[in-house]
A protein has these predicted regions:
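Radical SAM [4Fe-4S] cluster-binding motif and immediate context
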Residues: 24, 167-175
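Glycine-rich beta-alpha loop elements in corrinoid/cobalamin-binding modules
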Residues: 2, 31-34, 41-162, 166
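Nucleotide-activated donor-dependent transferases that construct or modify glycoconjugates
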Residues: 2-16, 66
Length: 175
């Protein structure tokens, strides 16, 4: 089984202990588990949602094959540092960044972030799942829509992803 770690770090509100369930990244995983090849080949080891010192978080990430990061304005810099440190420690780990703050025009992105392997654009459910299927040889990479690929620092982008039907996405609360 391949180890998957996901993170959608919370917005920090000074003086509060408010945390939330990382719904968006939970939906991405919930959708993935409905698709061929995922449950037989991958296990979700953890979903992180609380920003803590990266050294502490790294102790909880053991032998990752895939790290998926949902990025927003408030966690972009943290996610990029986490991605860099995970790639440094586990060079074989595939780093995937998606979410609302992922650049749609990603030319030059990988030159300054060589530790990121893939970006997902628009709705990440099918793109993330397609990448997981690619990693186990069940799908050609260029057939995975909505992805930018780090090709030795150059950006290769596949076609746009199609919108998915909300009825096809299970609730992460009910898994």
């Amino acid at each position: 089984m391949k180890n998957v770690y996901l993170a959608q770090m919370s917005l920090e509100i000074p003086g509060s202990n408010y945390y939330y369930f990382p719904y968006s990244i939970g939906v991405v995983w919930a959708y993935a588990t409905t698709q061929p090849g995922i449950n037989e080949n991958y296990q979700l080891c953890n979903i992180f949602s609380v920003k803590e010192p990266i050294d502490q978080l790294l102790e909880k990430i053991i032998d990752p094959d895939v790290l998926g990061l949902s990025t927003y304005t408030w966690n972009t810099m943290y996610n990029e540092e986490l991605a860099r440190r995970v790639k440094e420690r586990y060079p074989q780990c595939q780093i995937i960044i998606g979410g609302a703050n992922t650049p749609n025009l990603s030319n030059g992105y990988f030159k300054t972030r060589p530790y990121v392997d893939y970006l997902t654009h628009q709705e990440g459910e099918s793109s993330f799942t397609g990448l997981l299927q690619h990693f186990i040889g069940e799908r050609e990479l260029m057939d995975v829509a909505g992805v930018s690929i780090n090709d030795a620092g150059k950006t290769v982008t596949t076609g746009p992803s199609k919108r998915i039907e909300l009825d096809d996405v299970p609730s992460p609360y009910l898994m």
